[in-house]
Each structure stands twice: as structure tokens, then as C-alpha cells.
From Swiss-Prot:
The UniProt record lists the keyword Ion transport: no
Protein name: Formimidoylglutamase
Pathway participation: Amino-acid degradation; L-histidine degradation into L-glutamate; L-glutamate from N-formimidoyl-L-glutamate (hydrolase route): step 1/1
Species classification: Bacteria, Pseudomonadati, Pseudomonadota, Gammaproteobacteria, Pseudomonadales
UniProt-listed SUPFAM superfamilies: Arginase/deacetylase
Family: Belongs to the arginase family.
GO annotation terms (biological process): L-histidine catabolic process to glutamate and formamide; L-histidine catabolic process to glutamate and formate; putrescine biosynthetic process from arginine, via agmatine
Entry's cofactor comment: Binds 2 manganese ions per subunit.
Catalysed conversion reaction: N-formimidoyl-L-glutamate + H2O = formamide + L-glutamate
Residue sites binding Mn(2+) 2 per the record: D151, H153, C242, D244
GO molecular function, one term: formimidoylglutamase activity
Necessary cofactors: Mn(2+)
Length: 311
């Protein structure tokens, strides 16, 4: 049994005088049930154990409810159903929580839903990919899964235990064990936040990436072409946004704020472009830490990105 969602988080303004089209997220959201029609499903991963292990600033375990509150009062422009499937809560046993989340993702995908994960530290990424891989392996012997990560960090660290700094190395190892290609594209890499050893590791693994300074509004055509080339090489897409890819002024509520970062307008545009490819199967938003946020700026950014993925 999975815990029921806390529907009390879905509260906000009601514009009844404006008619039926004056809808907001909190009015449209429904608790998930196994007989629900295929639609978008929000699934939280309330964890910052990976952040703690990675020597970061804790608080991301409070991200999922903060993100729901930020979503609740947004105008709803969709027609399809949307459901809240609650949170997988991680304590000290991160690995068990990742397994639980992966199985939940696989089950939801098997029922035809598109899952949007709400983090939580970026340790959500390994759990998300594992769930997608589990689902696709039931139908394809050699699925070509692309991983699109908007992030200031490669997250390819070597460590004795899983953390928020290791998920894509773990995914690479999972792909190697399954004899699958490791197709990883990272947009927004900070040269000063990744050691030479991590750049070497990325090169060995064939990671495609663009630096934060290359992802500029005035250089959008190059970024689009880079993304399109990656999307053409895969059949299925897992998209993850680590909020520290954004400038600290836009997203202060993360463990490791970016001095440079990539503007929200660029990130949102490329997220929408990836979604429009028709290959998106699973997405998540990671590293929202409301304890470090200022005036809910980061939560609002995260909510807008979730809306971009859903509507």
C-alpha cells in the first residue's frame, strides 16, 4: 500500500463569478486511484538523504508539498484529468525508497499514465530511470532511452553509497549491466562546479552537454539544434530538471545555488521543445528546498515547469 495524497495542500482562489473556465489547479486535481483514466500523475519523492550524503544543505524532503502549494493556485488551461499519487517518503534508507519509487513509477506507466515526479533531492533521478527502464523492458529488448538533464552538475560522482551526486553514474552502470546504450544529455553544466575528473568521466561515458554560458537567449537556435540532434537519436525520453541549473536570483531555494546558471526562459523553452517531440515518457523536478527559498521564488519556478510538462 502507498500513502494517500494530502489533498489539503490543494487550496486556492475560487473565481466562481467568472464561470466554469476560471479553473485553477486546486479545483482540477483529484486523488489517484487505480481505476483512473490515463492522464498525468504527480508523484512526490520526499527525500534529502542523498543531499546529506553528498554534503549538501538539507531540506529538499519538504520540496513536494511546497511544490504542490505553489501549483495549487495557478490557472488551469488543460482539459485532461490530472491526479496526485502522494509521496514516497525516504528516511535513512535511501536505496529502499528509490526501489519503492521505481516500482510505483513502473506501475503507473503500465497503466498508461505520464508521471511527473516532485523532488526531493536529485537522487530521484536514479529511481525515476529505474522505473522507466523496468516498464520498457517488459515490451522492448533494447529500448533506446534518452536522459535529458537540465543541471549545473553532471552528477556522475563515484561514492560508496548512492547520493544526489551519483544518480547518472548509477544509471550508466544499470545500462551497462543491461547491455543498453547510455544516452545522457546534460544542459547547463557549470565548469566551476564540476572537477576535471568529472569532465573526464563524462567524456568516457559519451555524455553530450552544453555549458551554462552556451545556453543564452541570443544563441537559442544552436541550443535547439543540439537538443534536436539528441532527441532524434532516442525513442523514449526521461527529462529531469535540477533547479540549481537556474541563476541563484531566480532559484535561491536549492542546496547549491548557481552563480551563472541558465535563464528560466531558455530552460522552459527547451523543456517544451523536448515535450513536443512526442518521446517524453517521464519527467521530474528536483532539488527544491523550501527552507532556503525566498518569497517562494524557487517553488513558483518549479510550479511553472511542472505546468509546462503537463499542459
Amino acid at each position: 500500500m502507498y500513502p494517500a495524497p494530502d489533498m489539503s495542500l490543494w487550496q486556492g482562489r475560487i473565481d466562481s463569478q467568472e464561470g466554469a473556465d476560471a479553473r485553477r489547479w486546486h479545483q482540477w486535481m483529484r486523488p489517484y486511484a487505480d481505476d483512473a483514466e490515463a492522464a498525468s500523475v504527480l508523484l512526490g519523492f520526499a527525500s534529502d538523504e542523498g543531499v546529506r550524503r553528498n554534503q549538501g544543505r538539507q531540506g529538499a524532503r519538504h520540496g513536494p508539498p511546497a511544490l504542490r502549494r505553489a501549483l495549487a493556485n495557478l490557472a488551469w488551461h488543460g482539459e485532461q484529468a490530472i491526479y496526485d499519487a502522494g509521496d514516497i517518503v525516504a528516511g535513512d534508507d535511501l536505496e529502499a525508497a528509490q526501489e519503492c519509487y521505481a516500482q510505483r513509477v513502473a506501475d503507473l506507466l503500465a497503466r498508461g499514465h505520464r508521471v511527473v515526479g516532485l523532488g526531493g533531492g536529485h537522487e530521484i533521478a536514479y529511481a525515476s530511470f529505474a522505473g522507466l527502464a523496468r516498464h520498457l523492458s517488459r515490451h522492448e529488448r533494447l529500448p533506446r532511452i534518452g536522459i535529458l538533464n537540465f543541471d549545473a552538475h553532471f552528477d556522475l560522482r563515484h561514492a560508496e553509497r548512492a547520493s544526489s551526486g551519483t544518480p547518472f553514474r548509477q544509471i550508466a552502470e544499470l545500462c551497462q549491466a543491461s547491455d543498453w546504450p547510455f544516452a545522457y544529455c546534460c544542459l547547463g553544466i557549470s565548469r566551476l562546479s564540476n572537477t576535471a575528473a568529472l569532465f573526464d568521466q563524462a567524456q568516457r561515458l559519451g555524455v553530450r552537454y552544453l555549458l551554462d554560458r552556451q545556453l543564452q537567449p541570443w544563441n537559442l537556435e544552436r541550443s535547439e539544434a543540439f537538443l534536436d540532434s539528441f532527441l532524434q537519436s532516442v525513442d523514449h525520453l526521461y527529462l529531469t530538471v535540477c533547479l540549481d541549473v537556474l541563476p541563484a536570483a531566480q532559484a535561491p531555494g536549492v542546496s547549491a545555488p548557481s552563480a551563472h546558471g541558465v535563464e528560466m526562459s531558455v530552460v522552459e523553452h527547451l523543456v517544451r521543445r523536448a515535450k513536443a517531440s512526442g518521446k517524453l515518457r517521464l519527467a521530474d523536478i528536483a532539488e527544491l528546498n523550501p527552507q532556503l527559498d525566498s518569497d517562494q521564488r524557487t517553488a513558483r519556478i518549479a510550479a511553472r515547469l511542472v505546468d509546462s510538462l503537463v499542459n
